[in-house]
Regions:
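Active-site residues of response regulator receiver
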Residues: 10, 55, 83
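The feature encodes the CheY-like receiver
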Residues: 15, 33, 54, 59
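Acidic catalytic/metal-coordinating carboxylates
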Residues: 36-39, 60-65
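Short amphipathic alpha-helix used as the core "switch/output" element in two-component signaling
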Residues: 42, 64-76
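Active-site beta3 strand of CheY-like receiver
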Residues: 47-53
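Short, flexible helix-to-coil linker/hinge segments that flank and couple to helix-turn-helix
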Residues: 90-96, 101, 106-157, 161, ...
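Recognition helix of helix-turn-helix DNA-binding domains
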Residues: 169-204
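Basic, Lys/Arg-enriched C-terminal extension of HTH/homeodomain DNA-binding domains
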Residues: 194-220
Length: 220
């Protein structure tokens, strides 16, 4: 069984070539490369890869605008942002645009390919440094109040359970096992949760869970 198909978008020739070799050597198929965001969008529409590895700072169209365009097309393609810049503003802009994950270019090759598989499977992926800052930011805040945050009150009790599991980074398989339901049931709940909360990806759900205080570091 072959790995996910991948499109690499980066404005540096050496980076594109290096990523292509790393990915191909570990069982994934690179179906195309793009030197800028506009070309990445065009090739994604044409080739419909499983995953786009997207740099943020590129000419013509940056990676955030390209991500937003790809997500708006409602293709099955997932976007994994891979960048040198571990800056909060860029990261949150990328996640808001609909990226399914975020990793730094310094990520070890095996971890990068693991991340490609994770995102291709529809799961959320955040670089450890971003996850740590997200936790640190919200642990310093007092809990706003007890109970269900207002934005989450559109969810049923069961959907809140599933949402909490998503926020802890658990896969559909793990959620199904924890809640003693089928994977198909979990998938249905996840799709309904994202639709009700107007979210595009699971990674946006993780961020929202911390922002609303539903999930607190070290707690439930």
């Amino acid at each position: 069984m072959t790995g996910p198909t991948v499109l690499v978008a980066d404005d540096q020739d050496l980076v594109r070539s290096g990523l292509e070799m790393v990915i191909a050597a570990r069982g994934c198929e690179v179906v195309g490369t793009a030197p800028d965001g506009r070309e990445a969008v065009r090739l994604t529409r044409e080739l419909q890869p499983d995953v786009v590895l997207m740099d943020i700072r590129m000419p013509v169209m940056d990676g955030i605008a390209a991500t937003r365009a790809i997500v708006a097309d409602q293709l099955p393609t997932r976007v994994l942002v891979l960048t040198t810049y571990d800056l909060d503003s860029l990261v949150y802009d990328a996640l808001d645009a609909g990226a399914s994950g975020f990793l730094l270019k310094a990520t070890p090759p095996d971890r990068l390919v693991e991340g490609i598989h994770t995102v291709a499977a529809g799961e959320a992926l955040l670089a450890p440094s971003l996850t740590r800052r997200l936790i640190e930011e919200h642990v310093s805040r007092p809990p706003p109040y007890d109970g269900v945050p207002e934005r989450l009150r559109v969810l049923t009790e069961r959907e809140l359970e599933v949402f909490g599991q998503i926020a802890r980074g658990r896969s559909n398989d793990e959620i199904a096992e924890a809640l003693v339901v089928s994977q198909a049931t979990v998938k249905t709940h996840v799709n309904r949760i994202l639709a009700k909360l107007d979210l595009s990806t699971r990674v946006q759900a993780v961020v929202l869970a911390y922002e609303t205080g539903l999930v607190r570091p070290g707690g439930s």
